[in-house]
């Protein structure tokens, strides 16, 4: 279901229904929900620092990648690459 959620984010971005900032926000929520389901750790409201203490480097790396596009005054990022990295991280876990 999380891979399908990423596919929808990708399609919505490609079709102009999501801008960069919102695409990254949705990716962040997707990976956080996935981690919660897999570990029972409620990471939905964790800061990047909190996530760093979990010992899950893939998740830390992804959320760190999302931070600038999510919160910067001007969002920049490679949504397609980030979607692929997120998809790959989820596939390695399942």
Predicted regions mapped to residue ranges:
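Membrane-proximal, non-transmembrane interaction modules
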Residues: 11-94
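Charged alpha-helical initiation segments
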Residues: 1-14
